[in-house]
Amino acid sequence: MKVLDLRELNAMDKSQQTEAMTTVNLQLENMTAEHRVSWALEHLPQPAVLSSSFGIQAAVSLHLVTSQQPNIPVILTDTGYLFPETYQFIDQLTEQLKLNLKVFRAYISPAWQEARYGKLWEQGIKGIQLYNKINKVEPMNRALIQLGSLTWFAGLRRTQSSSRSKLPVLAVQQCLFKLLPIIDWDNRQVHSYLKKHGLNYHPLWEQGYLSVGDTHTTCKWTPGMNEEDTRFFGLKRECGIHEEK
């Protein structure tokens, strides 16, 4: 496959861009996750970045990508409301994998946000959307711009939620390439990779958490729940970072 020209793709209308990406994705679907990463590093423009929420399976993508580009910037958007175990997990993986961690936060501190808006996560879907815009979307957009990002790796998987079930391996989002190397993996493949490379799940995995975000909008899985029901009171799955703008 030839090197993709981001400027050409961004100049296309949506239908032309979709058609151009379809052929590439047909080939990427038949590659292993490792091959997808190596292909991207060879054919997509630099600088590249990797985003991580340091959730349940985070070690997979972090190891997968940094094994091939060790110094790639790893973007974390820190809301200030993560679980203590998440902060400990971040420290552990940063040391273990020698991550080039870049932490971005909202301009307004958590305490100031609560003073100004109250507890947004208790104010229904609109409150949650504003909370995510302040604490997740704006910091991530700022990170992508400040780091000059042209290619963005992320660890999304289709089996995680209905909103991710049809995502392609490669897309253009926010005028940059976004590659999802493990998009088609199931839980068994995740477990196998972690075991093979001596990596751990997030500490809360053993306590019944399937997905981990902020303390106030994450709950344990119970029988009858889908994974996406454990976040944002079941009102939504995405925080906005991975949604088309």
From Swiss-Prot:
Keyword flag Iron-sulfur: no
Reactions it catalyzes: [thioredoxin]-disulfide + sulfite + adenosine 3',5'-bisphosphate + 2 H(+) = [thioredoxin]-dithiol + 3'-phosphoadenylyl sulfate
Enzyme class: oxidoreductase
Keyword Oxidoreductase listed: yes
Pathway: Sulfur metabolism; hydrogen sulfide biosynthesis; sulfite from sulfate: step 3/3
Annotated active site: C239 (nucleophile)
InterPro entries: PAPS/APS_Rdtase (IPR004511), PAPS_reduct_dom (IPR002500), PAPS_reductase_CysH (IPR011800), Rossmann-like_a/b/a_fold (IPR014729)
Record's subcellular location: Cytoplasm
Cysteines engaged in disulfide bonds, as pairs: none
One Pfam family this sequence matches: PAPS_reduct
Gene Ontology MF terms in the entry: phosphoadenylyl-sulfate reductase (thioredoxin) activity
GO CC term, one of those recorded: cytoplasm
Gene3D superfamilies from the UniProt entry: HUPs
EC number: 1.8.4.8
GO biological process, one term: sulfate assimilation, phosphoadenylyl sulfate reduction by phosphoadenylyl-sulfate reductase (thioredoxin)
Alphabetic keyword roster: Cytoplasm, Oxidoreductase
NCBIfam families named among the record's database cross-references: cysH (TIGR00434), PAPS_reductase (TIGR02057), PRK02090.1 (NF002537)
Chain's role: Catalyzes the formation of sulfite from phosphoadenosine 5'-phosphosulfate (PAPS) using thioredoxin as an electron donor.
Family: Belongs to the PAPS reductase family. CysH subfamily.
Name of this chain's protein: Phosphoadenosine 5'-phosphosulfate reductase
Organism: Baumannia cicadellinicola subsp. Homalodisca coagulata
